[in-house]
């Protein structure tokens, strides 16, 4: 798959090996590039199509020497037909209103994020995220991006309670879910799945072909929910292809330890002291 970038040649960097937080006994590395301010959206489009994810003004993807477990996943919205159970999830959240807002951080969002992280990912790399970190995650960008807030319908003229929030990039061929978080004490809503389904609906309404979901790891219990979305495409060496029934029931890659959620990669863990110039 050939991609032509419209700006000066990008410089790619490689993080130094560090202990893998997801597969005990292994090491992880990432390749990344800084998105240019001039035509960041176009470059981000091209990189996303070949498996990169965005964190602030950095595009990255796994580049582990001995492991290829992380696979990019996207839902083909134009072909997607909601199942009965998926329609029920949307129905259980019909008391929520969707609000598209500018990519500007608020304390209300940050407080929701803190509750989510402390409950769902207390031992993860983002658990210690500070307010300045959150502001940078949302606002430090050179691409087309926005926030979607899901709020209870207000009983007065003020805004309803914030229940969920997601940072979304708008691409030429779809929507890319950068990071989502939600009230952790409302399991009946299935808010994680609801956010994905609602963005598939948004993509359909706007004639956008895909919704990019980040990385999927075969056999990971925490990531098994992604395989329940069908159809789903995953990126292989030969390009994007539909996930097969066999892949949906895939066992974990062979190796020590259990898999952890590769979608919860720290959003910006490549520090200058840890990189090598690939030029």
UniProtKB/Swiss-Prot annotation:
InterPro entries: Acyl_CoA_acyltransferase, Asp_Glu_LeuTrfase, N-end_Aminoacyl_Trfase, N-end_Aminoacyl_Trfase_C, N-end_Aminoacyl_Trfase_N. It catalyses: N-terminal L-glutamyl-[protein] + L-leucyl-tRNA(Leu) = N-terminal L-leucyl-L-glutamyl-[protein] + tRNA(Leu) + H(+); N-terminal L-aspartyl-[protein] + L-leucyl-tRNA(Leu) = N-terminal L-leucyl-L-aspartyl-[protein] + tRNA(Leu) + H(+). Keywords: Acyltransferase, Cytoplasm, Transferase. It is an enzyme of class 2 (transferase). Its EC number is 2.3.2.29. GO terms for molecular function: arginyl-tRNA--protein transferase activity; leucyl-tRNA--protein transferase activity. One of its GO terms (biological process) is ubiquitin-dependent protein catabolic process via the N-end rule pathway. Its main location: cytoplasm. SUPFAM superfamilies: Acyl-CoA N-acyltransferases (Nat). One of its GO terms (cellular component) is cytoplasm. Residues 245-279 are annotated as: Disordered. It is found in: Cytoplasm. The keyword Transferase applies. Transmembrane segments: none annotated. Functions in the N-end rule pathway of protein degradation where it conjugates Leu from its aminoacyl-tRNA to the N-termini of proteins containing an N-terminal aspartate or glutamate. Belongs to the R-transferase family. Bpt subfamily. PANTHER family: ARGININE-TRNA-PROTEIN TRANSFERASE 1 (PTHR21367), ARGINYL-TRNA--PROTEIN TRANSFERASE 1 (PTHR21367:SF1). This is Aspartate/glutamate leucyltransferase. It comes from Caulobacter vibrioides (strain NA1000 / CB15N).
């Amino acid at each position: 798959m050939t991609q032509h970038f419209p700006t000066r040649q990008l410089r790619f960097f490689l993080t130094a090996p560090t202990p893998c937080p997801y597969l005990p006994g292994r090491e992880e590395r990432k390749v990344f590039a800084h998105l240019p301010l001039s035509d960041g959206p176009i470059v981000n489009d091209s990189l996303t199509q070949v498996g990169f994810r965005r964190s602030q003004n950095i595009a990255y993807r796994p580049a582990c020497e001995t492991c290829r477990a992380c696979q990019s996943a996207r839902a083909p919205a134009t072909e997607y037909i909601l199942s009965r159970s998926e329609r029920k999830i949307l129905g259980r959240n019909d008391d929520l209103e969707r609000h598209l807002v500018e990519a500007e951080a608020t304390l209300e969002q940050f407080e929701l994020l803190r509750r989510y992280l402390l409950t769902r990912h207390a031992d993860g790399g983002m658990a210690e995220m500070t307010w300045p970190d959150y502001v940078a995650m949302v606002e430090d960008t050179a691409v087309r991006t926005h926030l979607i807030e899901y709020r209870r319908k207000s009983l007065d003229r003020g805004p309803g309670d914030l229940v969920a929030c997601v940072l979304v990039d708008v691409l030429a061929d779809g929507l890319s879910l950068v990071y989502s978080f939600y009230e952790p004490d409302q399991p009946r809503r299935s808010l994680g799945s609801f956010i994905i389904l609602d963005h598939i609906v948004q993509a359909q309404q706007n004639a956008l072909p895909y919704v990019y979901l980040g990385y999927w790891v075969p056999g990971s219990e925490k990531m098994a929910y992604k395989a329940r979305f069908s159809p789903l495409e995953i990126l292989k060496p030969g390009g994007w292809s539909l996930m097969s029934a066999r892949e949906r029931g895939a066992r974990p890659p062979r190796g020590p330890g259990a898999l952890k959620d590769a979608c919860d990669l720290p959003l910006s863990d490549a520090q200058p002291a840890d990189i090598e110039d690939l030029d």
